[in-house]
């Protein structure tokens, strides 16, 4: 396992200049690949950084037992009456051992565990570029992205997520956030969540942090889901009131492609009777082809398992077009009204062309929904009953839920994978 440390300084800490440095931040090194049809894949070096809020201790140095706020609300009003005071009064402690947060790398593999010594850690991490100073910006319109995944330890209720967020390349680095990307700041997505800090600065007004989100992979061993989530505003947008809601600036639901929801229950599952057997490692390929004008026209999925390419099946369900990829006609027929209203596939492609940050995480649902939207019988999304995906029940089935993402590759369509005869 390769790890790289940088001594925290006032310029790297992510705090105002009056704040003292607090230790070191150690990034995990990860080998990735850039690919072309003519030249094949070239090895590159990237780094992994934990999210600033969920992966670090943020506290008040003047009263170290006190934090500076919780997810879902503006920051602590005593510590953060203003952004400037918030930067002065709140410290973020560096992480020297990502393993304690369920994160480890080995060459081209990234392992994420939801539990560490029996305690929930649910890590969310971002991909830094080779300098460790900013995020790697992926521009996938007209290209494809591939990765290998081992996920046999993800039962009902788990979610291994690999997706893109239109975060800022520098993580919102500023006078009040001199740390930026190396400290995992700047997260946003189409759910427009309220967090104590946005772009590393105190979120005094309690805004939501909105931006386009491309869910390439949300999955466990029982169900999988692709969902683009376009927004009407480019980049990070601070929403207020109704702008943050279900009819606001971002498509919260997205247009989902889940084999179970399109009458293909035999396609993906946890034994060898399924076309894609989740108990075995697989390569997941997602393609983003364009039309003649250069606009994103579709989002296409295929798998490679055992040296065999497994294409997406053509939809044969009443009311839906007979397509084998996520397209505007599919999304419109599926009832994805906000998706269509907020730019649809072309709008998602615009965000992908501008550049997005790669996010990877593992989590379970503690809101009471038990991840039924992803894998539940009631929602038509999978084979899981209403209670087996409850966080209290998951460790009874699998004591150590985890996922390993390996060999991340992106480049020209057709350049990231190899396989034998297609299996339909």
From Swiss-Prot:
<keyword id="KW-0624">Polysaccharide degradation</keyword>
<dbReference type="GO" id="GO:0005576">
    <property type="term" value="C:extracellular region"/>
</dbReference>
<feature type="disulfide bond">
    <location>
        <begin position="239"/>
        <end position="244"/>
    </location>
</feature>
<keyword id="KW-0136">Cellulose degradation</keyword>
<keyword id="KW-0119">Carbohydrate metabolism</keyword>
<feature type="active site" description="Proton donor">
    <location>
        <position position="218"/>
    </location>
</feature>
<dbReference type="GO" id="GO:0008810">
    <property type="term" value="F:cellulase activity"/>
</dbReference>
<keyword id="KW-0326">Glycosidase</keyword>
<comment type="subunit">
    <text>Monomer.</text>
</comment>
<feature type="disulfide bond">
    <location>
        <begin position="192"/>
        <end position="210"/>
    </location>
</feature>
<feature type="disulfide bond">
    <location>
        <begin position="35"/>
        <end position="41"/>
    </location>
</feature>
<feature type="disulfide bond">
    <location>
        <begin position="188"/>
        <end position="211"/>
    </location>
</feature>
<dbReference type="Pfam" id="PF00840">
    <property type="entry name" value="Glyco_hydro_7"/>
</dbReference>
<keyword id="KW-0964">Secreted</keyword>
<keyword id="KW-0378">Hydrolase</keyword>
<dbReference type="InterPro" id="IPR001722">
    <property type="entry name" value="Glyco_hydro_7"/>
</dbReference>
<feature type="disulfide bond">
    <location>
        <begin position="255"/>
        <end position="331"/>
    </location>
</feature>
<feature type="disulfide bond">
    <location>
        <begin position="68"/>
        <end position="90"/>
    </location>
</feature>
<feature type="glycosylation site" description="N-linked (GlcNAc...) asparagine">
    <location>
        <position position="76"/>
    </location>
</feature>
<comment type="function">
    <text>Endoglucanase that is involved in the biological conversion of cellulose to glucose. Hydrolyzes internal beta-1,4-glucosidic bonds.</text>
</comment>
<feature type="disulfide bond">
    <location>
        <begin position="80"/>
        <end position="86"/>
    </location>
</feature>
<feature type="disulfide bond">
    <location>
        <begin position="231"/>
        <end position="250"/>
    </location>
</feature>
<keyword id="KW-1015">Disulfide bond</keyword>
<dbReference type="GO" id="GO:0030245">
    <property type="term" value="P:cellulose catabolic process"/>
</dbReference>
<feature type="glycosylation site" description="N-linked (GlcNAc...) asparagine">
    <location>
        <position position="385"/>
    </location>
</feature>
<feature type="active site" description="Nucleophile">
    <location>
        <position position="213"/>
    </location>
</feature>
<protein>
    <recommendedName>
        <fullName>Endoglucanase 1</fullName>
        <ecNumber>3.2.1.4</ecNumber>
    </recommendedName>
</protein>
<feature type="signal peptide">
    <location>
        <begin position="1"/>
        <end position="18"/>
    </location>
</feature>
<feature type="glycosylation site" description="N-linked (GlcNAc...) asparagine">
    <location>
        <position position="271"/>
    </location>
</feature>
<dbReference type="InterPro" id="IPR037019">
    <property type="entry name" value="Glyco_hydro_7_sf"/>
</dbReference>
<keyword id="KW-0732">Signal</keyword>
<comment type="similarity">
    <text>Belongs to the glycosyl hydrolase 7 (cellulase C) family.</text>
</comment>
<keyword id="KW-0325">Glycoprotein</keyword>
<dbReference type="InterPro" id="IPR013320">
    <property type="entry name" value="ConA-like_dom_sf"/>
</dbReference>
<feature type="disulfide bond">
    <location>
        <begin position="156"/>
        <end position="384"/>
    </location>
</feature>
